[in-house]
Amino acid sequence: MKLLEGKTVLVTGASTGIGRAAAIGAAQHGADVAINYAHSDGPAQSCVAEIEALGQRAIAVKGDVADPQTAQDFVAKAVETFGKVDVMVSNAGICPFHAFLDMPVDVVERTFKVNLHGAYFMVQAAAQQMVRQGHGGSIVAVSSISALVGGEYQTHYTPTKAGVHSLMQSTAIALGKHGIRCNSVLPGTILTEINKDDLADQEKREYMEARTPLGRLGAPEDLAGPIVFLASDMAAYVTGAALLVDGGMYVNLQ
């Protein structure tokens, strides 16, 4: 059963990591996919090729989500190519680890612009298009377990992910009358580009694995299923929800 048959799905930050897994997962479930990416062309084009190999259409649109115009351009290009927007997966994010007391101003500002402002304007642009279309839609934002817990070297990052979580709650209310559902996924420790240097520390990695009841760290593909589910009509009565995808880490307090 393909959960997204005939849908058009947009995914930000999709050349690698969770975004890439979500884009490919959507294609596996029958969707055409537009991906946003900010840096290297190679990984983005290989993602497009992988989606096309599944028999679906795909485009890659380069742009920095910190610029509000990027959101408008991304949605417009998707509509030009596919004719509509059914699902937005707002995933793009950064986390340059740094101590709190000497945190550079530019690191704080860049993190907020990418993670929170970028999510806001992508969600808004997609919602505007969905309202124009008149047949509802689904928005899934990638927040983090860090929306619920702190991190010594993430004082600039955790507020942005709490903000994304809150954004989905508020937009669920604002957009419900238009038939647009808004939900978030909260990944735990997932092996991606964002934390590969941090988890290169074997002692740190083993500690995080031990904290996880399922006994392993997550892979990007572990997020694809939950994202596809929330995007699909299987979740037609789910909005304003937050789904932890963390191997049980959050509940392991002892």
Swiss-Prot record:
Q: Which residues bind NADP(+)?
A: 13, 15, 18, 64-65, 91, 157, 161, 190
Concerning Gene3D superfamilies, the annotation shows: NAD(P)-binding Rossmann-like Domain
EC id: 1.1.1.378
- Reactions that this protein is recorded to catalyse: L-rhamnofuranose + NAD(+) = L-rhamnono-1,4-lactone + NADH + H(+); L-rhamnofuranose + NADP(+) = L-rhamnono-1,4-lactone + NADPH + H(+)
Q: Does the keyword Transcription apply?
A: no
Q: Which domain of life is it from?
A: Bacteria
Active-site positions on this chain: 144 (proton donor), 157 (proton acceptor), 161 (lowers pka of active site tyr)
Q: Which residues bind beta-L-rhamnose?
A: 144, 146, 154, 157, 189, 195
Q: Does the keyword Nucleotide-binding apply?
A: yes
Q: Which GO terms describe its biological process?
A: fatty acid biosynthetic process; rhamnose metabolic process
GO molecular function terms noted in the UniProt entry: nucleotide binding; oxidoreductase activity, acting on the CH-OH group of donors, NAD or NADP as acceptor; quinone binding
Pathway involvement?
Carbohydrate degradation; L-rhamnose degradation
Q: Which UniProt keywords apply?
A: NAD, NADP, Nucleotide-binding, Oxidoreductase, Rhamnose metabolism
| Catalytic EC class | oxidoreductase
Q: Which Pfam families does the annotation name?
A: adh_short_C2
Q: Which family does it belong to?
A: Belongs to the short-chain dehydrogenases/reductases (SDR) family.
Query: What exactly does this protein do?
Result: NAD(P)-dependent dehydrogenase that catalyzes the oxidation of L-rhamnose to L-rhamnono-1,4-lactone. Also shows high activity with L-lyxose and low activity with L-mannose. Can utilize either NAD(+) or NADP(+), with a slight preference for NADP(+). Catalyzes the first step in an alternative pathway for rhamnose utilization that does not involve phosphorylated intermediates.
UniProt protein name: L-rhamnose 1-dehydrogenase (NAD(P)(+))
Protein species of origin = Sphingomonas sp. (strain SKA58)
UniProt gene name: LRA1
